[in-house]
Amino acid sequence: MAPGAPSSSPSPILAALLFSSLVLSPALAIVVYTDREIYGAVGSQVTLHCSFWSSEWVSDDISFTWRYQPEGGRDAISIFHYAKGQPYIDEVGAFKERIQWVGDPRWKDGSIVIHNLDYSDNGTFTCDVKNPPDIVGKTSQVTLYVFEKVPTRYGVVLGAVIGGILGVVLLLLLLFYLIRYCWLRRQAALQRRLSAMEKGRFHKSSKDSSKRGRQTPVLYAMLDHSRSTKAASEKKSKGLGESRKDKK
């Protein structure tokens, strides 16, 4: 290499980007979803839901496969298969004529219904989906429990308890605000009554003051008149006394 010529090796930033795109980016794979547990009563029916996510468009070659492993068993057997737009139901096994296809691949739905449940149906059901070219991914499992009478789920009980507590809290809050409203209303009425009483007292005091103001000159006039009458009477009496002396 000639002195001063630029290096032909890739820059560290470009190498890091290439490494992250090839190594660090996760590979996309199909993801299948089912319930974890489902409960049913003897003689009833249950729906085993199965859906999926795929990075590819729904292919015409999409397939769904359901397998069943009995409770306490080791091996799983195929009980249902969907491919090329057609459902294939087991015709010789324990679920003969009891499985119904209710899925719709266009909506990424591979659900089935099991009719006329029995205690022997207890076990694990596995849903497997292939959507070529997206065929790599994990299956999903749902466990079926069959009872004579379906028990109340813990979540339902918990929800009922929480709902009851919230109802009581709301009732207490409503009662608190109602009592507070009545108390404030009563205080306002009492305040209005006190204000009216104060105004009445003020008006009465003003009237009394004005009445006393009007009565004062009259009293003074009456007093002056009384004094004048008394003086005149005394003067008259004195004059009569002097006239009597003169006659003697």
UniProtKB/Swiss-Prot annotation:
PROSITE patterns: IG_LIKE (PS50835), MYELIN_P0 (PS00568). Gene3D superfamilies: Immunoglobulins. Found only in peripheral nervous system Schwann cells. Residues 222-248 are annotated as: Disordered. Residues 224-248 have a biased composition (Basic and acidic residues). It is a single-pass type I membrane protein. Residues 30-143 form the Ig-like V-type domain. Homodimer and homotetramer. Glycans are attached at residue 122. Residues 180-248 are cytoplasmic. Belongs to the myelin P0 protein family. One of its GO terms (cellular component) is plasma membrane. The chain crosses the membrane at residues 154-179. It comes from the Eukaryota. Disulfide bonds join 50-127. Coiled coil: none annotated. GO terms for biological process: cell aggregation; cell-cell adhesion via plasma-membrane adhesion molecules; cell-cell junction maintenance; myelination. Its main location: membrane. Pfam families: Myelin-PO_C, V-set. This is Myelin protein P0.
